[in-house]
Amino acid sequence: MKIAIHNSRGSFSDRWIAYCDSKGVEYKLVDCYKDSIIQDLTDCDGLMWHFHQNSPRAILFAKQLLFSLEQSGMKVFPDFNTVWHFDDKVGQKYLLEAIGAPLVPTWIFYSKKEAISWAGETSYPKVFKLRGGAGSQNVRLVKNYSQARRLIRKAFNRGFAAYDPPGSLK
């Protein structure tokens, strides 16, 4: 058995490499971002890739590669059932509703008009969250309709920066 490991210093791959070395497990270091990644994996039985939720590049690509490889029969970590809802509050909401888990009342909007209408009728304060973001990142306490309307317009127009340095210090 030979495991491919996406080598990313300072991530879980450091521990995976050390483990393989200590246990005599054969592995190969790969770069999942290379166009030749599929070819690079032909002599491997599995792929391990810990991608970071704050990397827009990884978020756009990792799930597609891992799912494609899994569909071809390759063992991957994380697998589709582990990763599809990772750092995805919308996916998590629907999953929790589908299994009947207790859930804080949650509203998701796909149109600005519907969101602004809801904001005009709801009570405050409300917690606004973007789809992604760990910890308190992309979370705002909204105290009134005016503040809500401003955030809704921003969300449906130019959007929010992927990384908010001051917000990450909260």
Predicted regions and their residues:
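Extreme N-terminal starter segment of soluble prokaryotic enzymes
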Residues: M1-A4
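Active-site nucleotide/adenylate-binding loops and adjacent lid/helix of ATP-dependent enzymes
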Residues: V83-K170
